[in-house]
């Protein structure tokens, strides 16, 4: 049992190295213990310490003596086990290298977007050549955007170009400098030629693909795995060149650089989408105090006309109550209407116009809903009963209904009644029939309904005084009538 335990079979101990020379301890040294503390070193280091140094154990500082050395010869079984372990280790190492090599084989066809590499195409061969490399690095050209590590001319593109355009790869020290250069150069004109700039792509180094050390210290190819989202195949790049440019152009807004997602194969705009003037007006604090109405068409046509006129081909947009006009919107045109609070244009004496619409509506309802007098039953006033019933049946505007539309309807009724009267400049007086028609017209503003009813249904004994003129302004047949607004009685 003791012999089995002493057999050196631990995999961790197989990889044990000498703590002094850091060399792998051979199988013949694994059973060698030069000190009683158990601190193991190879026999070469033990002999060097004993002969050339102080001869003490590096761990416990005891003197190395021949009597304290513990050593056991290696058996044939241990040799076989050690040989089998070495073969297995070599086999695993070979498989690991093959897996890495197979994983890197497909990388030979991959191109990775390099964020510090700018590719400029469209330069003149007189400028972009091997003799002017130092000039291109200077502040007059690409050096003004940042420190340049290397400039390489794409000779293959120059040879295949029919227009003689040359492409140049500029490797900057910082990614921000490359983004600034691309944003400034792309779309510019140099020597009558339009320049195009974008991020450049690079490939993996052949030594890296073979899992070898690269012998070129200034190699500009990749020696480590690139970002997957920035990787493209040759077929992808070829198809994108025939459709739309690769999204390798940065977005620079207000000095900040935003790199577009390489997974999107299309360019993104350099500048942010600006708001339209109408959107800016809506977002501004001043626009919160205005009511904006828009109709999506082409040309604006706004006509400010009095609210008394109507048109079947126009849509009336009522103005606020403080305004004395409405807006007619003609269909087929775009209209942007800003309703501002306007001061009244009426004289100060017209205090009735300053009343709110609700007060006017309440007065009109009270005037219409009043019951007629007993004199309405008289046979001589039967002709006025339909007029009073018509006045009662008149539809008054509700609280939500627009007062302007109701006034338009009332004036239209007056105009239709006046159309029966013939006006002439030859005569100086109206005939009796025309005077009766004028007197039977209802008033435009009713503030004293009782006086109107008394005027319409006067008693029969006072009918004889109908044609007599009133004695004073505001007095008719002895019954008080409120004078028109803005006048003194």
From Swiss-Prot:
A zinc finger (C3H1-type) spans 199-226. Keywords: Coiled coil, Metal-binding, Nucleus, Repressor, RNA-binding, Transcription, Transcription regulation, Zinc, Zinc-finger. Pfam families: RRM_1 (PF00076), zf-RING_4 (PF14570). One of its GO terms (cellular component) is cytosol. It is found in: Nucleus. Residues 116-198 form the RRM domain. Residues 246-261, 466-479 have a biased composition (Polar residues). A zinc finger (RING-type) spans 18-61. GO terms for biological process: negative regulation of nuclear mRNA surveillance of meiosis-specific transcripts; nuclear-transcribed mRNA poly(A) tail shortening; protein ubiquitination; regulatory ncRNA-mediated gene silencing. Residues 246-268, 458-489 are annotated as: Disordered. Residues 76-109 form a coiled coil. GO terms for molecular function: RNA binding; ubiquitin protein ligase activity; ubiquitin-protein transferase activity; zinc ion binding. Its main location: nucleus. It comes from the Eukaryota. May negatively regulate the basal and activated transcription of many genes. This is Putative general negative regulator of transcription C16C9.04c. It comes from Schizosaccharomyces pombe (strain 972 / ATCC 24843).
């Amino acid at each position: 049992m003791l012999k089995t335990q002493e057999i050196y079979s631990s995999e961790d101990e197989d990889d044990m190295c000498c703590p002094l020379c850091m060399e792998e301890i051979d199988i013949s040294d694994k059973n060698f213990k030069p000190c009683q503390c158990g601190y193991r070193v190879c026999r070469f280091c033990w002999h060097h310490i004993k002969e050339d140094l102080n001869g003490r154990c590096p761990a416990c500082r005891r003197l190395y003596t021949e009597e304290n050395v513990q050593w056991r010869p290696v058996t044939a079984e241990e040799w076989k086990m050690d040989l089998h372990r070495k073969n297995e280790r070599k086999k695993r190492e070979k498989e690991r290298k093959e897996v890495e090599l197979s994983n890197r084989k497909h990388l030979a066809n991959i191109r990775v977007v390099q964020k510090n590499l700018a590719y400029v195409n469209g330069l003149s061969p007189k400028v972009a050549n091997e003799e002017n490399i130092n000039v291109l690095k200077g502040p007059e050209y690409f050096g003004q955007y940042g420190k340049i590590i290397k400039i390489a001319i794409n000779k293959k593109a120059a040879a295949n170009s029919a227009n003689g355009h040359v492409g140049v790869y500029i490797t900057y020290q910082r990614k921000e400098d490359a983004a600034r250069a691309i944003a400034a150069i792309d779309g510019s004109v140099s020597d009558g030629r339009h320049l195009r700039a974008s991020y450049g792509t690079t490939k993996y180094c052949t030594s890296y693909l073979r899992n070898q050390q690269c012998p070129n210290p200034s190699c500009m190819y990749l020696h480590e795995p690139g970002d997957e989202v920035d990787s493209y195949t040759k077929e992808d790049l070829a198809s994108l060149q025939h459709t739309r440019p690769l999204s390798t152009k940065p977005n620079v807004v207000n000095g900040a650089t935003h790199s577009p997602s390489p997974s999107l194969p299309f360019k993104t705009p350099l500048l942010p989408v600006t708001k339209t003037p109408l959107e800016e007006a809506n977002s501004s604090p001043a626009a919160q105090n205005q009511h904006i109405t828009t109709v999506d068409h082409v040309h604006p046509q706004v006509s400010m006309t009095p609210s008394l006129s109507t048109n079947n081909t126009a849509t009336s947009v009522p103005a606020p109550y403080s305004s004395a006009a409405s807006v007619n919107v003609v269909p087929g045109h775009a209209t942007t209407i800003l309703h501002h609070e306007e001061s009244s244009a009426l004289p100060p004496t017209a205090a009735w116009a300053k009343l709110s619409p609700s007060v006017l509506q309440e007065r009109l309802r009270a005037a219409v809903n009043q019951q007629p007098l007993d004199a309405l039953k008289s046979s001589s006033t039967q002709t006025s009963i339909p007029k009073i019933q018509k006045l009662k049946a008149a539809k008054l505007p509700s609280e939500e209904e627009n007062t302007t539309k109701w006034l338009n309807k009332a004036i239209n009724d007056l105009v239709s009644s006046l159309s029966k009267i013939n006006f002439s400049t030859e005569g100086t007086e109206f005939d009796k029939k025309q005077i009766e028609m004028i007197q039977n017209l209802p008033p435009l503003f009713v503030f004293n309904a009782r006086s109107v009813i008394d005027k319409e249904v006067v008693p029969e004994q006072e009918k004889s005084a109908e044609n007599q003129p009133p004695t004073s302004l505001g007095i008719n047949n002895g019954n008080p009538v409120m004078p028109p607004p803005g006048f003194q009685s």
